[in-house]
C-alpha cells in the first residue's frame, strides 16, 4: 500500500481498456481479401457447420471472420469488408463480414432484418 505522500507525488495509473477488435485499429470497418473460405464446428453444446473465412486485411493482419446469413458467394481472392463483432460459439472468430458490399452479395429472399444482411426491399 502506498502512503498518502507517494499517491500525491506519483498518483495511480489508470487502467487502459482493451479493444474487442484489435485488428481494425480503431476503424469502424476494414477491407480485406479472403485467403481461405471454409466451415467449422462450434463448441459444445452447439452443433452446426458455421461458414467462416480467413481474411488478409489492408493493414497486413490476417483474421478469421464469420459469414452471416443463409448461403454466400465468397471464395478465395474475394474482396470483403469486415466489421467487429464476435461469434460466441466459435473461438477465435472476432469479426463479421458485411453482406451486400464489395464482392459479398446480400442474402437472397430475406424479408426481415434486411439491412443487416444487405438485402434489397422486395417488390
Swiss-Prot record:
A matching Pfam family: Ribosom_S12_S23
The keyword Ribonucleoprotein belongs to this UniProt entry's keyword annotation: yes
Subunit annotation: Part of the 30S ribosomal subunit. Contacts proteins S8 and S17. May interact with IF1 in the 30S initiation complex.
Keywords: Methylation, Ribonucleoprotein, Ribosomal protein, RNA-binding, rRNA-binding, tRNA-binding
Biased composition (Basic residues): 109-123
PROSITE patterns reported in the protein's UniProt record: RIBOSOMAL_S12
Annotated segments matching region Disordered: 104-123
GO terms of biological process kind: translation
Main function: With S4 and S5 plays an important role in translational accuracy. Interacts with and stabilizes bases of the 16S rRNA that are involved in tRNA selection in the A site and with the mRNA backbone. Located at the interface of the 30S and 50S subunits, it traverses the body of the 30S subunit contacting proteins on the other side and probably holding the rRNA structure together. The combined cluster of proteins S8, S12 and S17 appears to hold together the shoulder and platform of the 30S subunit.
Family: Belongs to the universal ribosomal protein uS12 family.
One CC-aspect GO term: small ribosomal subunit
GO molecular function: rRNA binding; structural constituent of ribosome; tRNA binding
InterPro entries noted in UniProt: NA-bd_OB-fold, Ribosomal_uS12, Ribosomal_uS12_bac
Record-linked Gene3D superfamilies: Nucleic acid-binding proteins (2.40.50.140)
Primary gene name: rpsL
PANTHER family in UniProt: 30S RIBOSOMAL PROTEIN S12 FAMILY MEMBER
Modified residues (3-methylthioaspartic acid): 89
Transmembrane segments: none
Domain of life: Bacteria
UniProt protein name: Small ribosomal subunit protein uS12
Amino acid at each position: 500500500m502506498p502512503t498518502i505522500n507517494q499517491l500525491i507525488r506519483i498518483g495511480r495509473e489508470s487502467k487502459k481498456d482493451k479493444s474487442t477488435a484489435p485488428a481494425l485499429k480503431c476503424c469502424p470497418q476494414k477491407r480485406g481479401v479472403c485467403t481461405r473460405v471454409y466451415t467449422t464446428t462450434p463448441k459444445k453444446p452447439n452443433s452446426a457447420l458455421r461458414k467462416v473465412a480467413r481474411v488478409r486485411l489492408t493493414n497486413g493482419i490476417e483474421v478469421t471472420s464469420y459469414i452471416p446469413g443463409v448461403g454466400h458467394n465468397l471464395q478465395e481472392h474475394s474482396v470483403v469488408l469486415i466489421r467487429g463483432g464476435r461469434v460466441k460459439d466459435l473461438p477465435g472468430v472476432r469479426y463479421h463480414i458485411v453482406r451486400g458490399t464489395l464482392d459479398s452479395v446480400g442474402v437472397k429472399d430475406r424479408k426481415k432484418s434486411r439491412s443487416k444482411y444487405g438485402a434489397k426491399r422486395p417488390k
